[in-house]
Amino acid sequence: MNTLSVLKGKRALWLLAAVVLTAIVTYIIEEFGLSAISLFEGGLLSMTPYALTAVGECINEKSGVVNIGLEGILAITAVTGVYGAELFDNGFLGLLVGALTGGFMGFVFGLVSVYGKADQTVAGTGINIFSIGFVQYLLMSIWGFPGIHILERRLMVRPIYTPIGQISIVTIFAIIVAGLAHVLLYKTVLGFRIRAAGESPQAVDVAGVRVDRIRTLSSTLGGALCGLGGAFMSLCWMGGVVKEISAGKGFIALACVVFAGLEPLLALAAALIFGFTGVFAFSVAVTPGVKEIIPFYFVNMVPYISTLIVVTIAIGRRRFPKASGVPYRRE
């Protein structure tokens, strides 16, 4: 059996699995009287922070920098996004503040890991731990309450109406960004340098290109997209901020990255899967006749269980850059 036959066989299996899954989901929707439009809208909302964060991290890791501090960046930028919206009296400017905050955090992470040669796992973990206390500090110092802050409805970034439901402008932007990231990485000189910095930084250095600058730029861009995802959660989705607003979304985004093998378009597809899985499970859990049987907290575990399964299956089958997570030292 040649390689082409194997690929065709795998595609047929994936197509069959997709058809079966679609049939099961359709049956459950009809059986429990769920709204397909509501599931669609909720799935896109849930998908957006995953997609933005995962696509940004794909670019980052292609350059050889691994940032596991996405959870902390999402939490902090969710707060700064709301603060920016109230400060400038504009939700879109709040999104910009969130993106800039995330970009700054990515830049600092780049300085620490690229120029400081710090262990990237430790640095990313530090961001996550730092965010736990810093988010509460921001909530208390800005609004005088450490747990929650509700945003005025007029400052929320409203979705646009389409024939298939309401869709956020940021969601559309996230889909476009995934395509642009693919073009950047595979169709431009900068993208070639980013990929080369992750595969063979010595060769890039010999060619006269600064590896440290390429990696820092990638880290900054990844942080900015993650920051936009954090601001999206508070300004476009939840209408406010709580101290646990990220709730593991940064780690799920990392699972999307692993599943995709650092490919932006596959990361977008993974984000769609995780987003719709969580919303679908929640919708079924609150349906009369089901919520009395299945504990609500058990259903809340579904996205995280699916994350563990996906990472376990995918991590051994994906190829990552040879210099991934390894600081480059010029000889």
Functional labels for PLM-detected ranges:
Residues 1-23, 181, 199-213, 284-331:
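Cytosolic-side transmembrane-helix boundaries in multi-pass membrane proteins
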Residues 1-52, 80:
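Membrane-interfacial amphipathic/re-entrant helices at transmembrane-helix boundaries
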Residues 2-9, 62-66, 105-161, 187, ...:
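Short loop segments and helix-boundary regions at transmembrane helix junctions
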Residues 32-40, 185, 222-257, 289-290:
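Inter-helical junctions in multi-pass inner-membrane proteins, predominant
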Residues 38-88, 95, 104-120, 258-262:
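Single transmembrane alpha-helix segments in multi-pass membrane proteins
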Residues 104-106, 250-278, 305-313:
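Hydrophobic alpha-helical transmembrane segments of polytopic membrane proteins
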Residues 120, 131-187, 216, 289-299, ...:
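Transmembrane helix-bundle core of multi-pass membrane transporters
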Residues 165-241, 264-265:
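Helix-loop-helix "hairpin" substructures at the membrane interface of multi-pass membrane proteins
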